A protein has these predicted regions:
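Phosphate/anion-contacting hairpin/loop surfaces
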Residues: 2-74, 78-227
Length: 227
């Protein structure tokens, strides 16, 4: 807390999203069960990945769209990695890609963190919305304020209907003693699977003309009503 009891301001965060214009630029061998069935919230125990291959007909960018693995993280170039390494992150793990000379220097950037335990559910006003082409309709704004309930709603409703979303109407509030500002790269988890980058990281990446990724400012860290 700052003097006078004013709450620390949360800095701007951006969602990192693969550029759709390039299509799938890399693929995983179907036989690699340990990779394809990885627990999203656990670190991998292997030090390299040899089952990812570059699609030679595609444009090579700093961040490559890998389709089936995109849920776990990002396939990034050495330049992208070296920039991110300068900033504090929450349970982000980089693993070397080997075997394909076209991917020399690339790493897979796993987002293993779960910050849903750090959210203050009574202060965070979660609502269930339907988002059809950015036209929001509130379906339920009287949700039981608990982590268990939010995860269940995400699993039973949102995961089976891509247009339904759980949204923190006035932005995330976090439990006392936890400061989200100390992390520049992270994922919330469960009902929010986006990959978040702070404004400082985004500026550093853009200064180096990083390609293959789009950054969209997230309203989930804003105190203003957005649904």
């Amino acid at each position: 807390m700052l003097a006078g009891g004013i709450k620390n301001k949360i800095m701007k965060y951006y969602k990192g999203i693969n550029d759709a214009e390039y299509g799938f630029q890399a693929q995983v061998d179907f036989g690699d069960e340990k990779l394809l069935k990885k627990d999203i919230y656990k670190e991998v125990e292997f030090s390299f990945i040899d089952s990812i291959n570059y699609v030679k007909t595609k444009v090579k960018t700093d961040v490559l769209d890998i389709g089936s693995l995109s849920f776990h993280g990002l396939l990034v170039s050495e330049k992208f990695y070296s920039i991110c390494e300068r900033f504090d992150s929450h349970q982000v793990q980089f693993v070397d890609i080997i075997g394909d000379e076209n991917l020399k220097g690339y790493k897979f950037m796993f987002f293993n963190g779960d910050l849903t335990t750090k959210i203050d559910y009574r202060k965070t006003n979660f609502i269930l919305c339907e988002n059809m082409l950015d036209e929001f309709e509130v379906l339920n704004e009287n949700l039981e304020p608990s982590r268990k309930n939010m995860i269940n709603i995400d699993k039973e409703i949102c995961s089976v209907d891509i247009f339904k979303q759980l949204i923190p109407k006035n932005g995330f509030s976090f439990i006392e003693g936890f400061d989200i500002n100390k992390y520049n790269i992270f994922r919330i988890g469960h009902f929010d699977e986006h990959f978040y980058f702070s404004e400082k990281v985004v500026k550093a990446l853009k200064a180096e003309n990083i390609t293959g990724i789009t950054f969209v400012e997230s309203v989930n860290f804003s105190p203003f009503t957005h649904c």
